[in-house]
Amino acid sequence: MAKERGLISPSDFAQLQKYMEYSTKKVSDVLKLFEDGEMAKYVQGDAIGYEGFQQFLKIYLEVDNVPRHLSLALFQSFETGHCLNETNVTKDVVCLNDVSCYFSLLEGGRPEDKLEFTFKLYDTDRNGILDSSEVDKIILQMMRVAEYLDWDVSELRPILQEMMKEIDYDGSGSVSQAEWVRAGATTVPLLVLLGLEMTLKDDGQHMWRPKRFPRPVYCNLCESSIGLGKQGLSCNLCKYTVHDQCAMKALPCEVSTYAKSRKDIGVQSHVWVRGGCESGRCDRCQKKIRIYHSLTGLHCVWCHLEIHDDCLQAVGHECDCGLLRDHILPPSSIYPSVLASGPDRKNSKTSQKTMDDLNLSTSEALRIDPVPNTHPLLVFVNPKSGGKQGQRVLWKFQYILNPRQVFNLLKDGPEIGLRLFKDVPDSRILVCGGDGTVGWILETIDKANLPVLPPVAVLPLGTGNDLARCLRWGGGYEGQNLAKILKDLEMSKVVHMDRWSVEVIPQQTEEKSDPVPFQIINNYFSIGVDASIAHRFHIMREKYPEKFNSRMKNKLWYFEFATSESIFSTCKKLEESLTVEICGKPLDLSNLSLEGIAVLNIPSMHGGSNLWGDTRRPHGDIYGINQALGATAKVITDPDILKTCVPDLSDKRLEVVGLEGAIEMGQIYTKLKNAGRRLAKCSEITFHTTKTLPMQIDGEPWMQTPCTIKITHKNQMPMLMGPPPRSTNFFGFLS
């Protein structure tokens, strides 16, 4: 029986995407071989037969033996010159242009292009409209995709039929290409429903990681001991644990990240998994769970309640998500947007967007209605930050939160998560990484045009982390309990951090400059000695990363570079090579002998060094007068007033500090000296340089040829300030 054109199964499509993920080939590379290379013999006019198609897949996917069912399904999904027959495809042909177009779109085509291609795929009579029979085929494919995604298809067909009627904007009884593209790009996630965006198919699959167990653990499948100190596999999402050899027979993962039926929306139920009771005590009866003797006890994957098997009947059906409910999006709060009622779909905020503003994919296929009075947390993790810390943090958050709240930045980037959360009220963002990762997220938020800016907290990974220090999140994560950190986040307060635009205007010169790393300052900017040290540090770390894998080593390397810089003094008499203007007025540097100037948005630099220094309150009325002036004036250069100024990352002003040399910089970095020389506090600053000088923005150094640099206020970003540390009294007790 001939197979319907276009109806490649969702499982086949998912398998194809896996092959493409690991392939390095581009369609353009393969086409060259078919046009004038060794594969030209398979081309028949503008078409290829099944044998040629198999060769195309073999080269493009870099797989010697593509499964026959997959190659046949793909071959039969394209326009053909003859009636297809599953038993004999040797005489059939497909258009090479259709094949190349399809795979080019999968490589990364625009949503509009994908929608146009799918329209032509289902418009079998090529009359430019989709009639009722063609719409029925589309609904059939959507039902197959929904079944593959484990949705409740019993209630879905009438919903899809109603949705397809809504796409017919002019009520003509058919769907034009313009209506199809408009709907798919603004209101209806057609590409997801047709199986062309398959990232929703995560549920039911364990996320295994090897784990060595320091105490007795029992296999969830065969229930025998894995062995003390032996390695097994544990699922990051549900803690289902097995022997290596038992993994293939394991039951599906119990974690469903979103509701797949209308009846599951709104109320969350407990999801119990046997074992995994790490505390060893029942949360219901408070008695011990004998976890060392057999596979016993139950734990809920959402509230993390741990109970005896016999206590299950005493625990209610409904799950409140436990102590971290303020941060968690339970599956009952996330559901396919197609399950929303018709009026809700029509009034959706996405319907007001244009195609240029939106890429309807997985993020728009799901709708989020959070539990009232909660603050859903969107977590971005850079797994490369902090050595192996980033990966471990990613695993932990995937367990304690809904995995759909947690994004691997190296794999997904931040855009998908921001699109998913764009309409979620009272949401927060947690960035797990260094200052560079935080800057990346803030820049992406800038470009995302979100209706409301969610406040951002930082879990610092690795070294440095000046911004995290200023926001009271510490200098680096050291394996603390993440649940406690999330409870601290509940007590945090919002501050609006200034961000500054940097414009570098090079002079006409034959000398070539390094690229400027950023156009925005979040932390600091500097010229001269400290940038020179940072530049040498940066080059050495890129060349020999293994020598810079601890904070102590970094400090020693920095001190060594500072010592050599003090000998060569490459930035001596800096005032002869640059002039500084603050709010249009020149800053007098003539009586100073400086080798560096730092412009600070936050008081921390180089992993905790406070270049501005502490502000101590002296006695006398003059202090109060000076402090009042310092809190209001846009430009301050008076040394007496500067002594009273306290850095504030929300005051739309910058602190300007002079550095006398590398030795002073090294002393500040190693805490042997308190601060540099306070020069000014201002809301705008301009540098004019006459020779090539080292510079840095937020720890990223570069060499800059003669230029003009303008720093102006850009905007403010809501950030979360951690709660103040609890003090201890003389006897060591918390006060």
UniProtKB/Swiss-Prot annotation:
<dbReference type="GO" id="GO:0008289">
    <property type="term" value="F:lipid binding"/>
</dbReference>
<feature type="binding site">
    <location>
        <position position="172"/>
    </location>
    <ligand>
        <name>Ca(2+) 2</name>
    </ligand>
</feature>
<comment type="subunit">
    <text>Monomer.</text>
</comment>
<feature type="binding site">
    <location>
        <position position="123"/>
    </location>
    <ligand>
        <name>Ca(2+) 1</name>
    </ligand>
</feature>
<dbReference type="GO" id="GO:0004143">
    <property type="term" value="F:ATP-dependent diacylglycerol kinase activity"/>
</dbReference>
<feature type="binding site">
    <location>
        <position position="125"/>
    </location>
    <ligand>
        <name>Ca(2+) 1</name>
    </ligand>
</feature>
<dbReference type="InterPro" id="IPR038199">
    <property type="entry name" value="DGK_typeI_N_sf"/>
</dbReference>
<feature type="domain" description="EF-hand 2">
    <location>
        <begin position="155"/>
        <end position="190"/>
    </location>
</feature>
<dbReference type="GO" id="GO:0035556">
    <property type="term" value="P:intracellular signal transduction"/>
</dbReference>
<dbReference type="InterPro" id="IPR046349">
    <property type="entry name" value="C1-like_sf"/>
</dbReference>
<dbReference type="InterPro" id="IPR037607">
    <property type="entry name" value="DGK"/>
</dbReference>
<dbReference type="InterPro" id="IPR047469">
    <property type="entry name" value="C1_DGKalpha_rpt2"/>
</dbReference>
<dbReference type="InterPro" id="IPR002219">
    <property type="entry name" value="PE/DAG-bd"/>
</dbReference>
<dbReference type="InterPro" id="IPR011992">
    <property type="entry name" value="EF-hand-dom_pair"/>
</dbReference>
<feature type="binding site">
    <location>
        <position position="174"/>
    </location>
    <ligand>
        <name>Ca(2+) 2</name>
    </ligand>
</feature>
<dbReference type="Pfam" id="PF00781">
    <property type="entry name" value="DAGK_cat"/>
</dbReference>
<keyword id="KW-0443">Lipid metabolism</keyword>
<keyword id="KW-0106">Calcium</keyword>
<dbReference type="GO" id="GO:0046486">
    <property type="term" value="P:glycerolipid metabolic process"/>
</dbReference>
<dbReference type="GO" id="GO:0008270">
    <property type="term" value="F:zinc ion binding"/>
</dbReference>
<feature type="domain" description="EF-hand 1">
    <location>
        <begin position="110"/>
        <end position="145"/>
    </location>
</feature>
<dbReference type="InterPro" id="IPR018247">
    <property type="entry name" value="EF_Hand_1_Ca_BS"/>
</dbReference>
<dbReference type="InterPro" id="IPR016064">
    <property type="entry name" value="NAD/diacylglycerol_kinase_sf"/>
</dbReference>
<dbReference type="GO" id="GO:0046339">
    <property type="term" value="P:diacylglycerol metabolic process"/>
</dbReference>
<comment type="pathway">
    <text>Lipid metabolism; glycerolipid metabolism.</text>
</comment>
<dbReference type="GO" id="GO:0005509">
    <property type="term" value="F:calcium ion binding"/>
</dbReference>
<keyword id="KW-0547">Nucleotide-binding</keyword>
<comment type="function">
    <text>Diacylglycerol kinase that converts diacylglycerol/DAG into phosphatidic acid/phosphatidate/PA and regulates the respective levels of these two bioactive lipids. Thereby, acts as a central switch between the signaling pathways activated by these second messengers with different cellular targets and opposite effects in numerous biological processes. Also plays an important role in the biosynthesis of complex lipids. Can also phosphorylate 1-alkyl-2-acylglycerol in vitro as efficiently as diacylglycerol provided it contains an arachidonoyl group.</text>
</comment>
<dbReference type="InterPro" id="IPR029477">
    <property type="entry name" value="DAG_kinase_typeI_N"/>
</dbReference>
<feature type="binding site">
    <location>
        <position position="179"/>
    </location>
    <ligand>
        <name>Ca(2+) 2</name>
    </ligand>
</feature>
<dbReference type="InterPro" id="IPR000756">
    <property type="entry name" value="Diacylglycerol_kin_accessory"/>
</dbReference>
<dbReference type="GO" id="GO:0007200">
    <property type="term" value="P:phospholipase C-activating G protein-coupled receptor signaling pathway"/>
</dbReference>
<comment type="similarity">
    <text>Belongs to the eukaryotic diacylglycerol kinase family.</text>
</comment>
<feature type="modified residue" description="N6-acetyllysine">
    <location>
        <position position="484"/>
    </location>
</feature>
<keyword id="KW-0418">Kinase</keyword>
<dbReference type="GO" id="GO:0047649">
    <property type="term" value="F:alkylglycerol kinase activity"/>
</dbReference>
<dbReference type="GO" id="GO:0006654">
    <property type="term" value="P:phosphatidic acid biosynthetic process"/>
</dbReference>
<dbReference type="GO" id="GO:0046834">
    <property type="term" value="P:lipid phosphorylation"/>
</dbReference>
<dbReference type="GO" id="GO:0016301">
    <property type="term" value="F:kinase activity"/>
</dbReference>
<dbReference type="GO" id="GO:0005829">
    <property type="term" value="C:cytosol"/>
</dbReference>
<dbReference type="Pfam" id="PF00130">
    <property type="entry name" value="C1_1"/>
</dbReference>
<dbReference type="GO" id="GO:0005524">
    <property type="term" value="F:ATP binding"/>
</dbReference>
